[in-house]
Amino acid sequence: SAANALQLPFADNTFDKVMCSEVLEHIPDYQGALKEIERVLKPGGLFCASVPRHWPEKICWFFSEAYHQVEGGHLRIFKAGELKQQIETLGFHAFHQHWAHALHSPFWWLKCIFWKTQNSNWVIKQYHRFLVWDLMDKPVFTRTLEKILNPIMGKSVVLYFRKEAN
């Protein structure tokens, strides 16, 4: 079953850790969702949020209007610094940030360039097979390549916070 991100079915200060991965860009009232996360997280608890990184996402929006107009799709593009500030105003302290999924950026750019034929496009299908292979087998070469490319073109930014103790 699904929960409403603006009314989580949990008591205040329930969790030691909360993770919100690739969700906030889909929620109309993402600030309300962040307030709910703050509410259910214990003082001193850890919060991890990941969202699509600004510039790789901008490229997707540039190549395809349909990409961000699908039902339940991305409603906004976050800038990491601005999102971090918004979360800190809720009583969190940011302590780490990194980028992830660099090998996924070209896949999404291709999908956006060839939006109307993405399901039948040979190049996109092969790239998808490559990503699945990479995720399942975790070869040293692609893991190393992604570590090198993540700071440059990681598809996602991952932010880590600690909720202030009372």
Task: Write out the residue ranges for each language-model feature.
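A C-terminal cap/extension of S-adenosyl-L-methionine-dependent methyltransferases
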Residues: 62, 99-166
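Short, flexible active-site loop motifs that bind/organize anionic cofactors or intermediates
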Residues: 5, 23, 73, 93-96
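A SAM-dependent methyltransferase catalytic signature shared across enzymes that methylate proteins
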Residues: 81-98, 135, 162-163
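Secondary-structure boundary/capping signal
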Residues: 31, 45, 67, 91-95
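Conserved SAM-binding loop
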Residues: 1-60, 80-84, 159-163
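Acceptor-substrate binding/catalytic loop of class I
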Residues: 65-82, 99-101
